[in-house]
Amino acid sequence: MKLIALCCLLLLGLLGFLAAPGVASPSRHTGPGNGSGSGAGSGNPFRSPSSQQRPLYYDAPIGKPSKTMYA
């Protein structure tokens, strides 16, 4: 009985510890640069102020469909 209670307390403690930093961390969508969308103040630490978004490149070029005839 004590072992089950100890396991439950340990599990609740781990869940509380893992959930607590997420509550304290600031949201990406709120902050000083909410309307700008880019720059160092927008909450994105990986985007530099002078960088522009690059176009999306696919892994393989998309060509015309083959003319395979299925019976």
Curated annotation (Swiss-Prot):
Signal peptide segment: 1-24
GO biological process: defense response; defense response to other organism; innate immune response; response to bacterium
Propeptide: 25-26
Region Disordered, residue ranges: 26-71
Keyword annotations from UniProtKB, A to Z: Immunity, Innate immunity, Secreted, Signal
This protein's GO CC annotations: extracellular region
Cellular compartments annotated: Secreted
Induction of synthesis: By bacterial infection. Detected within 24 hours of infection.
Ligase recorded as keyword: no
Composition bias, Gly residues: 32-42
Tissue-by-tissue expression: Hemolymph (at protein level).
Principal location class: secreted
Highest taxon of source: Eukaryota
Signal in keyword set: yes
More details: Not induced after bacterial challenge in strains carrying a loss-of-function mutation for Toll. Constitutively expressed in Toll gain-of-function mutants.
Protein name as annotated: Immune-induced peptide 18
Source species of the chain: Drosophila melanogaster (Fruit fly)
